[in-house]
């Protein structure tokens, strides 16, 4: 994985453009997400553990919003010899190019179809595992339920969805507390007040977090009857839903 340091927002910018997963971001993404998302490494490792437990032979796995391929690699390490196929999708050409380099660095008997495209257009079928790792929050809110419905329909009985997201809270004091804890996490990882402020402005219009209640209601309404929050650190969470 690329280990270049994230300094994208280190200098003052008069105009802050909306955040996008362009070549600049792709080049520092590993560092950016490690320093910005508490528990990211644990989430990635546990996705691999879920794959070991739930992926059935001759089925498909979908990594929707695969970025540099961290989840795909974690899954692939755990499912050797099962004759499965991973479909890894991202709409950023820069991310896909770097993801391909990361995949090529490891030998595996599990095929990966790396697709540069919109996850909303992907046909999901014969799936034992679908991963949405900090991806749903970037879709327009009105498109999220349709995607969850498509995932549910494409999962085999007993298959799972792992959904990781930044979350918000209806309780205002809790929202403020955990948001401040997250900012302290970023400060402790070397981000300046300028970097934090400018990135927040860049994300404001493109990332719209939901509450845990909204996530659970959406999953339940589309048919998932088994749901649990399995990880939370501050305002970041990962959930698992079983069909």
Curated annotation (Swiss-Prot):
Gene3D superfamilies: Vaccinia Virus protein VP39 (3.40.50.150). Keywords: S-adenosyl-L-methionine, Transferase. Signal peptide: none annotated. Pfam families: Methyltransf_25. One of its GO terms (molecular function) is S-adenosyl-L-methionine binding. GO terms for biological process: tRNA wobble uridine modification. HAMAP family: Cx_SAM_synthase. Belongs to the class I-like SAM-binding methyltransferase superfamily. Cx-SAM synthase family. Catalyzes the conversion of S-adenosyl-L-methionine (SAM) to carboxy-S-adenosyl-L-methionine (Cx-SAM). Homodimer. This is Carboxy-S-adenosyl-L-methionine synthase.
